[in-house]
Amino acid sequence: MRATIVTGVFAGIVVAALSAAAAQAPTPRAGTEQSGKSLKNDQDAANSRLLAAAEFFEALAEQAFSATSSKLQNLVSKAEKAGQDVNATLPADTQGALDKQLSAIKQAQKANNPSELALAAAEGYKILVSLTQGTKVPSAVSLLDYAGFRYNADLKSNPTRWADMQTAVEFAQEQWRSISGQISQASLQKSFNSALTRMEQAVEKKSAKAAASAVKDEQDLVDKLEVYFSKK
């Protein structure tokens, strides 16, 4: 009888202990959710690093034609440092691609060639923003900005690089198609379609004046796209 009682008590203790352990152990779903949050946090941190570095390349692409020599030197130095700081976190093949653009930036600066400088900066910008994932503002918006930088640098080259301007327009059209369906604001849709059409028509006519006007509108509209998506 005593053995039966002891056995029963022991069994009760074991069951209670197992129940407590089960209550404390994370369920597979909880573990999956925690892992998902961790991965999202890691990607958010990576996105922040990439976009922060990309800003210096963006500034260089925008100001390559207008900055004073001292300002340009400062912009180049900042882009170079930003690129070097983020490069170690990039995939191996991308590291080489970014290094190539950093080298091209320095060579263009030494040669006093603002169009090549702007183009290299734009390519560096493209490399970085293309690696972002799951951002509130789609990477396609940043790539539309890149297309505008490239088109503008081609336009200001001597001689004007009309063929590459057409390639830049086609790239922009591809990016626009990937996100235009997400935009419910009809006026923004219409304006952006118009800007891209005008950019292409300017190339067909080889009209520098029309091209300059169209690409300015495109880049202004990219800013509006950024605001639109950030508020969604």
What does each of the following model-derived ranges do?
Residues 1-4:
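Positively charged n-region of N-terminal signal peptides that target proteins for export
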Residues 8-17:
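Bacterial N-terminal signal peptides
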Residues 20-23:
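Boundary at the C-terminal end of the N-terminal hydrophobic targeting segment
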Residues 25-81, 88, 137-142:
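Immediate post-signal-peptide N-terminus of mature secreted/exported proteins
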Residues 38-49, 64-71, 90, 106-116, ...:
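Non-transmembrane, amphipathic alpha-helical segments
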Residues 54-61, 110-196, 215-232:
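Extended amphipathic alpha-helical interaction segments
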Residues 80-120:
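Mid-chain, structured segments of secreted extracytoplasmic proteins
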